[in-house]
């Protein structure tokens, strides 16, 4: 609901932000959930707000229905635009805190988690006043150090491809243990049988990448959204951390949940 999208390989139609999706049911569920991929709604199957939609609708606005007031709807959508990156940062911090190898920065990560959690639970005015860019800048150094600590556990010094354009790259069987792939563009990359253990995958774009047989155990900051946007098979080893969703194994595979959020 809150976010816009354009007609593309991920969506079959255009939708402006703040406009209800034509597939939204009265109970906020999706009327075509079981057929999203075959109908061309792949973007919906890989979207994850990290719980921000539920936080805004159920906590910040205490269950208020945006359909009853255009003004309330606009305010809720504005809060969601801030809440989503806050919850994304919380997810990354939680991933880093789950790892014993990142213990040297646990205190800093816990302080970041406390500040972000307090903001997420604040009133709408406080959330709207937050500077998302400043929040990212404050948390990113600890996340970067945590990622480096994970990468240091690799038996070999991994390559640094931070922000690299590796779209369509032929990396089948590549030894990418301990690699930095932060923000790398890996759309359509061939990563079959690649070894991605201890790799830092924060922000890596894996849409359409082939992870069949790839080993992602112990990789850091990869999310279920990233894996859902990639392709894989039964031999793809799940990655470590908090997320266990495998890459899509067929064009029809979608996340199991069919319920929508009042803000989505």
Regions found by a protein language model. Give the residues of each.
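Hydrophobic scaffolds flanking metal-cofactor catalytic centers in soluble metalloenzymes
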Residues: 1-107, 112-130, 135-138, 142-152
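Tandem repeat scaffolds
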Residues: 144, 152-264
